[in-house]
Amino acid sequence: MKPISERRCGKDGVSAGIARKFGSNGFRVVLLSRTETSLQRSLEDLRQVHIESYGITADASDPDPIKAAFTQIENLYGITDVLVYNAAHIAPGDALSLTEQQLIDDLKVNTVGALTSAQQVIPDMVERKQGTLFFTGGGIALNPNPLYASLSIGKAAVRSLALSLAETLGPHGIYVGQVLIADHVQRGTFYDPDRIADVYWELYTNRDRKEYLFKE
């Protein structure tokens, strides 16, 4: 059975780039997306380049659908070898305009969903003493953007989560890495999703860095 790489579909192209990279290297890809339309579009693109891929819809802001999705994945496709969490809620606004509820709602996607997703695959990885967890971060985790206060907070939080997991899971043979993307992802630029995907593959292969700042 081929290894399984799971990820959450995104609109920025990072998910698609990673899926193509891992899929072209023998991974069977399972996508999780909030909407069926986005999911089917992503699957169609992958299958056109002959990548074995499947998909399930789940809302990253709600733990119950996430847990149900991972149960379904294990039942249908087997144990997860690589998890990539790429979901984010990107909403403009400075800290003065940010409400408590907005921050809570955004953190459900930007951070809590990452923890919930990881918790679904960690027990099997610990038992097998192998596995990889990836989290897509942002340069704003290091240098907050005042115009995107909530996202800056969320990316800082998920960075801390990833670093904490790396320390905790490393002794169990599990690699945890993250890529901090410092600008807008756009095809044909330095921040092309396929260039970013190459970094994920490099980290997966070498397993020698806890984080990589992708910055021009």
Model-derived regions: residue spans:
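C-terminal helical subdomain
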Residues: 163, 170-216
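The beta1-alpha1 cofactor-binding region of Rossmann-like NAD(H)/NADP(H)-dependent oxidoreductases
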Residues: 36-37, 57-69, 100
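Conserved glycine-rich Rossmann-like NAD(P)H-binding loop of the short-chain dehydrogenase/reductase
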Residues: 27-41
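Amphipathic alpha-helical dimer-interface segment in Rossmann-like NAD(P)H-dependent oxidoreductases
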Residues: 109-127
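Catalytic Tyr-X3-Lys loop
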Residues: 89, 96-115, 158
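Catalytic loop of short-chain dehydrogenase/reductase
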Residues: 13, 132-157, 163, 170, ...
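Active-site loop of short-chain dehydrogenase/reductase
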Residues: 2-3, 79-80, 94, 125-137, ...
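Canonical Rossmann dinucleotide-binding motif of NAD(H)/NADP(H)-dependent dehydrogenases/reductases
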Residues: 1-29
